[in-house]
Design a protein with these regions (language model features):
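Short gly/ser-rich loop at a beta-strand->alpha-helix junction or flexible surface loop bordering the NTP-binding
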Residues: 1-197
Length: 197
């Protein structure tokens, strides 16, 4: 026969009250996503990044955006071009990751676009422990290799985030050898746009 043990009221209420919640800082586990599915809220609260749903509010900082793609990055890869620009300034998430791998390695992953070559140390920065091209280098690479619309948008984005014309031209000057493809077009775009003084 079960024995009744008297319990103080405050102990019972403390047991039933909600425990402190830990914020979601990354990809939610599948079991949590199945419970939380609500079509009208998903579009407002979650962003699809390379097939993983990420909480939208964690993507407001460069560190949060880097954390969102860190699991998909290969070891010692350096983020380049549109992916690096997205990490720095935000906007629509990338469909693929552009990276430079040491030793010219290639990847078979469908979402990974690899480039050969090394970036000069002055054209890289570290965000959240991962090496990434600077805003200036990312914009210059898009201006060299992207479509005309992407090229102009990248330079305008860099300008709007405080990168000067001189900085962009100096960064463009670092593009040597095979990395010099598209330099005349990028230089023309940089010199054609009005910059803040």
């Amino acid at each position: 026969m079960a024995r009744f043990v008297p319990v103080p009221g405050h102990a019972a209420v403390a047991h039933l009250s909600a425990r402190p919640l830990t914020p979601v800082l990354g990809t939610l586990p599948p079991q949590d996503m199945e419970v939380l599915r609500c079509a009208s809220l998903d579009a407002r609260l979650l962003v699809n990044i390379l097939g993983n749903l990420q909480p939208a509010d964690t993507l407001r900082s460069a560190e949060g955006r880097m954390r969102a793609i860190a699991a998909a990055l290969p070891c010692r890869g350096v983020l380049l071009a549109s992916t690096a620009l997205w990490v720095h300034v935000g906007g629509p998430p990338p469909d693929s990751l552009e990276v430079s791998l040491p030793g010219g390695r290639r990847s078979r992953l469908p979402y990974l676009v690899t480039r050969r070559g090394r970036l000069p140390h002055c054209d890289t920065t570290v965000i959240g422990g991962i090496t990434c091209a600077t805003i200036a280098r990312a914009a210059v690479d898009i201006a060299r290799l992207g479509t005309p619309v992407q090229a102009v948008q990248a330079i305008l984005t860099a300008r709007d985030h405080g990168v000067s014309r001189v900085r962009l031209l100096l960064t463009l000057n670092h593009c040597r050898g095979a990395a010099s493809r598209g330099c005349p077009r990028a230089q023309h775009i940089i010199e054609s746009l009005a910059f803040h003084k």
